[in-house]
Amino acid sequence: MTQTVTQALQDFSLRYQQAWQNKHNELPRNEELADLVSPCVEEKCDGAVLWKAFPREEMADFTNVENAIELTLHEDIKAFYGSQYSADMDATWQTNPLTLLQVWSDDDFVRLQENILGHLVTQRRLKLKPTVFIAATDAELDVISICNLTGNVILERLGTDKREVLAENVVEFLAKIEAAV
């Protein structure tokens, strides 16, 4: 049976949590999110939160973004951002560091939608094929995105047409990245 994006994301989240616990003997810790409410929070301690990914009861709705930009988002994009709450997770792709972007709370989801919309508007203005970012890299202008037309996971230079396919789809990409704790 073919794995879904939701399953692949849950699998990576568990691999990340296990790697963190193996190294630090506790759930993943985050100081930056300590004052923000989230269903991910398991415990607060020493100005930080211990957290774990939390599945959404219902898939998040992207209709407002799709209507605003008059574009249907690829199902993989909606599943990637709409299936769970989580802190961002550090990982590597073929030894290259990245930060997998996630949604911490409903308030964070609103900010994400605004950022996706701004990204798509900029791409339309520059006459670039639409993509939605899923990970940040160490290079300020390079992001890892899902191509809205093909579902390919790509490394792209923001504001340009420079793109490199990393994986056929997000399920393959998530299976091949390694948790970096």
Swiss-Prot record:
<protein>
    <recommendedName>
        <fullName>Protein Syd</fullName>
    </recommendedName>
</protein>
<comment type="function">
    <text>Interacts with the SecY protein in vivo. May bind preferentially to an uncomplexed state of SecY, thus functioning either as a chelating agent for excess SecY in the cell or as a regulatory factor that negatively controls the translocase function.</text>
</comment>
<comment type="similarity">
    <text>Belongs to the Syd family.</text>
</comment>
<keyword id="KW-1003">Cell membrane</keyword>
<dbReference type="InterPro" id="IPR038228">
    <property type="entry name" value="Syd_sf"/>
</dbReference>
<dbReference type="InterPro" id="IPR009948">
    <property type="entry name" value="Syd"/>
</dbReference>
<dbReference type="Pfam" id="PF07348">
    <property type="entry name" value="Syd"/>
</dbReference>
<keyword id="KW-0997">Cell inner membrane</keyword>
<keyword id="KW-0472">Membrane</keyword>
<dbReference type="GO" id="GO:0009898">
    <property type="term" value="C:cytoplasmic side of plasma membrane"/>
</dbReference>
